[in-house]
Amino acid sequence: MIKRLLLLLTLTLSTLKGWSQDPQFSQFYANPLYLNPAMAGSALAPRATVNYRNQWPALSANFVTTSFGADIYLPRFNSGLGMLVLTDSQGLGNLKSTEVGLQYAYQLRLNEETYVRMGLQGTFATRTLDYFGLTFGDQYSNQGYTGNPTQEPIVGNGIPQVSYADFSSGAIVYSDWYWAGLAMHHINRPDQSFSGLELARLPMKTSFHAGLRIPFAGYTYLGDELDREKTISPAIMYKSQGKFDQFDAGLYVTYSPMVFGAWYRGIPIKKYAENINNHESLIVLAGFRQDKFSIGYSYDATISTLGFASGGAHEISLSYIFEEITPKRPRPRRKDRQLSCPKF
């Protein structure tokens, strides 16, 4: 009985934590528009992405997130345009959110080898909370749950909904062998209160991501295009939102057309609380990329107090890059350089 109560408490706290945190993706480079608005148009061609994540599938308090992204590069203006649609359903209480964001990014050449991209994003978001399945304090007595209907006034108002505008920005600098980016989401800290009686501001999220691309064998070219990539890419990401922060460190191995990766997520030098270590998950990834198409699968093995009872997290990513758009009267220019970060 004690173990069940502890598990319920852990799930409840994790769900409440999720209300003030953004959904996360382990394959963050497979969802570039969600990671950093500066990555809009970074494929230098029209691109479409789909990402699906199911976290804690073995529990009723699971988190299911789906996103669709589309972006395009406009070479005449050194600019990228993007659109991101995201839906998220968070476990206990059926908290659901839908977001539609538009992005603009500008690409600037610093020198022969180095580029910088800067991006802005405007988002319209809607959240709803279905109280079905939730219980409240007045439904309990000394003997436990009574089953009586709650008298909480907010429950009688139907399914509450809140909508708000949200703004984000980001930048990334890169060359053929490294990249480093910084993104700031929810700069305006919008109010997401359902009752409207008190402010419930969405905390700003700051994330830093960086890595290296190291060849372990010679590149194979087909004409002017890279035909087979053989690289090792160590990478890190740190993000902070409100009172919560997270660190990811891992390695990609690319041997075209296959990509494999392994990651650790957690901050071992920082504890959640006394005697509770900050170890979250170990992540493994397998991906396939052929021509313009990419598909990836990753699994998060939970190593926190939830353990294997949660079922970890499953994630699938799809991406397709269309033919480049060339102006009818192209002006003489140097060939732009794609981002060197992995595609998963």
Task: Give, region by region, the residue ranges found by the protein language model.
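Short, basic/polar N-terminal leader/transit segment immediately after the initiator methionine
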Residues: 2-6, 22-24
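Subset of outer-membrane beta-barrel
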Residues: 21-344
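Sec-dependent N-terminal signal peptides
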Residues: 4-14
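Sec/Tat signal peptide C-region and signal peptidase I cleavage site
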Residues: 16-20
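Generic N-terminal leader/processing signal
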Residues: 1-2, 15, 34, 326
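Positively charged n-region of N-terminal signal peptides that target proteins for export
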Residues: 1-4, 110-112
